[in-house]
A protein has these predicted regions:
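Auxiliary alpha/beta "docking" domains used to position bulky ligands
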Residues: 1-209
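Iron-sulfur cluster-binding cysteine motifs and their immediate structural context
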Residues: 216-246, 264-288
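C-terminal amphipathic alpha-helical segment
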Residues: 252-288, 313-317, 321, 327, ...
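Amphipathic alpha-helical scaffolding segments comprising HEAT/armadillo-like alpha-solenoid repeats
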Residues: 310-314, 341-353, 373-375
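Structural detector for internal amphipathic alpha-helices that build alpha-solenoid repeat scaffolds
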Residues: 329-340, 361-371
Length: 375
């Protein structure tokens, strides 16, 4: 029976064990009526009022669901929050080695392998099926009414705040979640369920913010996107964030920000690479995050040689595909402009210019001029 605290705790312990066996690094439980969601909505609305979301208009919608996650899935009584480590190789501690390879394309580490959204949802569905089987075997009275739905950065959910309430870490000044024994190189996912599983109060109480006076992530950010708010908290101005500029932004990258992007063509890891807590970063336990098509070492000119079909073929099942071929080439053009002088770069930029959109051509012209300025 699921009507006693001991039995509920036993089921939670079983779920945690299954989650770990599937490859999740951690697992916690949150009630959908947790007051943190209303508090986060206030912060979101302030952020929106300042225009810091840029063109990400989806942040303006579904505020009722953000404040009350139960509206997303009927009969939700608990949310299982999980995290999944994605590092394949440990980076040098407290340094940004990406800056040492100006002719290479730098892609955020989470995006070099399979799209984590697909991986996460697949694992969460497997976890849900295991729970369903457990209920059928040991608690048949709950099996028929069991409702679940997996999410991974795919719905209006305050994902980091939810994970923080589940005891999976604290929100750092770079606004990413940090675990004291695992750093921040992990992705998050949620499984909404109809089971009345209580929050892990003890687990939550053992993890509090330990950023202290450290400002490493703030200082290392090339565009100074991390800002302290009047309330003493920190947020990220997406309009300045390299991840936003190279992934979410559809159109022209502001000219004044292009030199600061360097050779980052999809996302940016700088604020994580410099974080002292990532000396504890754990490596991935599944192969999905292994780099595909040498995306951990590929040169800018190699990527520039891709045509539209190459892009579709080599980004199949990858989060990179969502940025689209033309914007991807826009990003590579900017990086080529920032690379050391090379006549070969100038020649390749001009050869490909007629094949791309007017918007990308403008970035090619900028990149060409940057190269000429170094000659």
């Amino acid at each position: 029976m699921l009507d006693t605290t001991n039995e509920l705790n036993a089921l939670k312990g079983w779920i945690k064990a299954q989650a770990k066996a599937l490859g999740f690094a951690d697992c916690g439980f949150v009630h959908p009526a947790n007051p943190i969601f209303v508090k986060q909505l206030d912060a979101l609305q302030t952020w929106l009022a300042q225009g810091k979301h840029g063109d990400m208009l989806f942040f303006e919608d579904n505020h009722d669901k953000r404040a009350n996650p139960a509206l997303l899935v009927d009969r939700t009584q608990s949310i299982i929050s999980v995290r999944l480590d994605y590092l394949v190789t440990p980076p040098p501690k407290r340094s940004v080695p990406d800056n040492e390879r100006p002719n290479s394309a730098i892609i955020a580490r989470y995006a070099r392998g399979r799209d984590y959204h697909k991986t996460m949802r697949g694992l969460l569905k497997t976890l849900a099926r295991l729970i369903q089987d457990k209920l059928t075997t040991d608690y048949p009275q709950y099996a028929n009414d069991f409702v679940f739905r997996p999410f991974s950065d795919s719905a209006p959910i305050f994902e980091r705040a939810l994970a923080e309430q589940a005891g999976l870490g604290w929100t750092g000044k770079h606004t990413l979640l940090i675990h004291p024994q695992a750093g921040s190189f992990f992705v998050l996912g949620e499984l909404f369920t109809s089971l009345p599983l209580a929050e892990d109060k003890k687990q939550i109480e053992t993890i509090s913010s330990h950023c202290g006076s450290c400002r490493a992530c703030i200082h290392v950010c090339p565009t100074h996107a991390i800002r302290r708010t009047p309330t003493g908290h920190y947020d990220v101005d997406a309009r300045l964030c390299i991840s936003y500029l190279t992934i979410e932004l559809d159109g022209k990258i502001p000219v004044e920000l292009r030199p600061k992007i360097g050779n980052r063509i999809f996302g940016c890891d700088d604020c994580q690479l410099i974080c002292p807590w990532n000396k504890f970063a754990r490596l991935a336990t599944i192969e999905d995050f292994n780099p595909r098509h040498r995306l951990d070492e590929v040169s800018l000119l190699e990527l520039w040689a891709w045509d539209a079909q190459d892009f579709l073929t080599k980004t199949e099942g990858s989060p990179i595909r969502r940025t689209g071929y033309d914007n991807f080439m826009r990003n590579v053009a900017v990086a080529l402009g920032n690379a050391p002088f090379s006549q070969a770069i100038i020649d390749k930029l001009q050869q490909k210019r007629p094949m791309l959109s007017e918007n990308t051509q403008e970035h090619i012209d900028w990149a060409t001029q940057q190269q000429l300025n170094k000659s």
